[in-house]
């Protein structure tokens, strides 16, 4: 049992015993709200799945989720009046706990387009092209347990950055050629960095650049955010010619998350929130270069 709050519980459900309670929530969300045909909402996998119910303080079902034998998360549903209370996050985390207990190396899911950021914050990475399921736009997402998932494009790289910022305790590190246009100027990434930087307590975002002039000339939107929070953000530019030729770009946090793009001018690579060996290596490399690089005093507001 995992609690989502003082008046909410997440409990394992038995499909045969709890079928009606599971169906009531799922029909309300998928069939009536999202107009999914009833015959598509129920499938042959249902009796074989591990199911969860979210119960309110009076024991009434308000949310569902399931883990299928093909290692896929699905049927994530929370009744409309109960959204925004962390119930979806609690259901998802409980399924990840169960997947780890079973020793699964990876789980996947089909995310509706509007829910991509929700799953990204939990460490899921988009993969493959968008597709339609029951007439609704979806994209497949995966999460390694532990380890890194393949990153195929800018949306997947952004998803990893959202997760790194969301899981970080006190620190983020970014190594970039010139603030990665198409990635570090995305609104969802900027919002994630702002949320991290403005959380209570001491926070630090360190950014190493190979070219500090280009972001300033192009008006990179991360710079005004950093200038409003000078106690959090610090920028340095590499000086050593060897560092200037380093081909990769990467990010790491202080909880074992990492994103590594072998060719920094491309978005593809690997990343995840549970990749401690890579995160440690990247942090050590970052510290060495940081110490021999120059502070970007030109970024400060006069």
Where are these regions (language model features)?
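Conserved GNAT-family N-acetyltransferase fold
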Residues: 52, 63-65, 76, 139
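Conserved active-site tyrosine of GNAT-family acetyltransferases
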Residues: 26, 119, 124
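Conserved GNAT acetyl-CoA-binding A-motif
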Residues: 99-112
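PLD/PLD-like phosphodiesterase catalytic module centered on the HKD motif
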Residues: 147-173, 177-302
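Short amphipathic alpha-helix that is part of the acyltransferase structural core
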Residues: 2-51, 55-60, 72
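Conserved acetyl-CoA binding element of GNAT-fold acetyltransferases
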Residues: 68-81
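Conserved catalytic-core motifs of GNAT/GCN5-like acyltransferases
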Residues: 108-110, 125-140
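Conserved acetyl-CoA pyrophosphate-binding loop and the N-cap/start of the following alpha-helix
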Residues: 82, 86-94
């Amino acid at each position: 049992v995992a609690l989502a709050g003082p008046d909410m519980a997440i409990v394992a459900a038995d499909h045969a015993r709890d079928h009606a309670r599971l169906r009531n929530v799922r029909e309300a969300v998928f069939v009536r709200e999202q107009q999914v045909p009833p015959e598509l909402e129920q499938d042959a996998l249902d009796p074989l799945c591990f199911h969860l119910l979210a119960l309110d303080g009076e024991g009434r079902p308000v949310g569902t989720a399931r883990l299928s034998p093909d290692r896929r998360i699905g049927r994530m549903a929370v009744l409309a009046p109960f959204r925004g209370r962390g119930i979806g996050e609690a259901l998802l985390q409980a399924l990840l706990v169960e997947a780890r207990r079973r020793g699964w190396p990876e789980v996947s899911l089909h995310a509706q387009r509007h829910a991509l950021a929700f799953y990204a914050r939990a460490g899921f990475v988009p993969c493959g092209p968008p597709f339609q399921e029951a007439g609704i736009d979806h994209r497949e997402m995966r999460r390694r347990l532990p380890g890194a998932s393949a990153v195929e494009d800018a949306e997947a790289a952004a998803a990893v950055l959202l997760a790194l910022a969301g899981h970080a305790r006190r620190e983020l590190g970014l190594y970039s050629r010139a603030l990665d246009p198409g990635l570090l100027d995305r609104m969802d990434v900027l919002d994630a960095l702002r949320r991290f930087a403005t959380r209570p307590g001491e926070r630090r975002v360190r950014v190493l650049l190979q070219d500090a002039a280009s972001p300033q000339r192009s008006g990179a939107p991360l710079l005004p955010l950093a200038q409003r929070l000078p106690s959090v953000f610090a920028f340095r530019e590499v000086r050593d010619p060897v560092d200037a030729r380093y081909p990769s770009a990467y990010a790491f946090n202080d909880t074992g998350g990492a994103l590594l793009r072998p060719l920094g001018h491309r978005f593809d690579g690997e990343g995840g929130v549970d990749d401690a060996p890579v995160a440690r290596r990247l942090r050590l490399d970052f510290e060495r270069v940081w110490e021999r690089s120059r502070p970007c005093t030109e970024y400060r507001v006069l």
